[in-house]
Every structure is written in structure tokens, then in C-alpha cells.
């Protein structure tokens, strides 16, 4: 009873608040040829004594004006689970628009659990930018998925990796599509628990030829004392 009273006196804040979504940029073009970037998603709040971490907000899309690169803003990371018990929050999704040839990691990562609880799932990567004159017509690479959060130090499964974003389409029917992104890495279990599953790889963007499919993410490591590794994600 005494320990129960201590827990009650400490209070249980419940689930933490989620991070806000980043706004999309407008369509205007600045003097250097760049349109504005979308806002980044907010990080999810951490839980108190017992509770689930808040989910990360989604990243905004870039503006639609002509520019050298289109970059989708990053999704926020998930919040950490409660000190005694609680799962980590899920990561936010990345905005659409990846650098040509390079998948900028813009998906939020899942939050980790502290003592007992499962890691949060990673967010999805944003899709690649459409091909443009500045990219030689080639579609941009899809963004990788976010990593799953780690399970609790004592017990908990790793979070699943996020799905990757599809490659961007070629500028026209004779332009190559961009490569699909790589699936996110599954979260790790510490002592007891299974590793998180890897995220799914994404298909390449349409074009001539179509972009290469992205591989699935690797599964997370199982617990040191008990647990199995997570499975790899499917290829795009």
C-alpha cells in the first residue's frame, strides 16, 4: 500500500502530447530561385512516470516554385516512454521532396522506452522530388524510413522501422525515375524482448527506365537474455 501511495502521489500524467506538424511552404520563388521549405515537425513530448511518449509531428512539403532542389522537411522524433512503464511515441513522417540521387533522411525516429515498454515505430520517409532541368531530368531519391525506438532496459520490444518514400518521377517519359528509399532499421531490444521489424523499401519512381527499388530495412537486435532479432523489411 505504501508503494502504491507513492506512485499515486507522484502522479500519472498519462500520454504525452504530440509534436505539431510543420506547415507546407508557399508557392513563391525567391530571388535565388528557391521556394520556401516546409516547417519541421515538432518532437513528441516525453511521458512522466507512467505513460506513452507523444508522437512526432509530420514535416511539411516544400513550395512549388522553380528551384535547384526540392527538400521535404523532417518529421519530429517520437517522445520517450514513462520512467516506470510506457511505450515510446512514433516518429513523424517526412515531407515529400528528396535531393536528386541522395535520399536525405527526413523521417522522424521512434521514441525509446525507458524501463518497461516497447519502442515507437519510425516515421515514413517522404517521396522523392520530380525530375527537373537542374537534376538532368532524373527523379529524386525517396527518403529512407525512420528507425524504430529501442525497447525498455528491462523489458520491451524494439519498434518497427518506418517505410521508405517512393522515388520521384522523371521529368518526362524519357527521363529516368529516382531510386526508392531504404526501409528504416528496426529498434533494438535490450535484455528481454524481440527486435523490431525493418521497414519496407520503396519502389523506384516512374520513368525511362524506372528507378531502382529500395531495399528493406534490417531488423533490430533481440534482447541479450531472451528474444529474437526482428525480420528484415520487404524490398520495394
Where are these regions (language model features)?
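Long, compositionally biased tandem-repeat segments
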Residues: 1-4, 8-236
Amino acid at each position: 500500500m505504501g508503494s502504491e501511495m507513492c506512485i499515486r502521489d507522484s502522479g500519472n500524467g498519462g500520454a504525452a502530447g504530440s509534436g505539431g506538424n510543420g506547415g507546407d511552404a508557399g508557392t513563391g520563388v525567391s530571388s535565388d530561385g528557391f521556394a520556401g521549405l516546409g516547417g519541421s515537425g515538432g518532437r513528441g513530448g516525453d511521458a512522466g512516470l507512467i505513460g506513452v511518449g507523444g508522437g512526432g509531428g509530420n514535416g511539411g512539403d516544400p513550395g512549388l516554385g522553380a528551384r535547384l532542389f526540392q527538400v521535404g522537411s523532417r518529421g519530429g522524433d517520437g517522445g520517450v516512454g514513462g520512467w516506470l512503464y510506457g511505450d515510446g511515441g512514433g516518429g513523424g513522417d517526412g515531407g515529400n521532396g528528396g535531393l536528386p540521387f541522395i535520399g536525405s533522411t527526413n523521417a522522424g525516429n521512434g521514441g525509446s522506452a525507458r524501463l518497461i515498454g516497447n519502442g515507437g515505430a519510425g516515421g515514413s520517409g517522404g517521396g522523392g522530388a520530380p525530375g527537373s532541368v537542374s537534376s538532368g531530368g532524373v527523379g529524386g531519391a525517396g527518403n529512407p524510413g525512420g528507425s524504430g525506438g529501442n525497447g525498455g532496459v528491462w523489458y520491451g520490444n524494439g519498434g518497427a522501422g518506418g517505410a521508405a518514400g517512393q522515388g520521384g518521377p522523371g521529368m518526362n517519359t524519357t527521363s529516368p525515375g529516382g531510386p526508392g528509399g531504404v526501409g528504416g532499421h528496426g529498434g533494438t531490444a535490450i535484455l528481454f524482448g524481440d527486435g523490431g521489424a525493418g521497414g519496407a523499401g520503396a519502389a523506384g519512381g516512374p520513368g525511362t527506365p524506372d528507378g531502382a527499388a529500395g531495399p528493406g530495412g534490417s531488423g533490430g537486435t533481440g534482447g541479450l537474455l531472451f528474444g529474437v532479432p526482428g525480420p528484415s523489411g520487404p524490398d520495394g
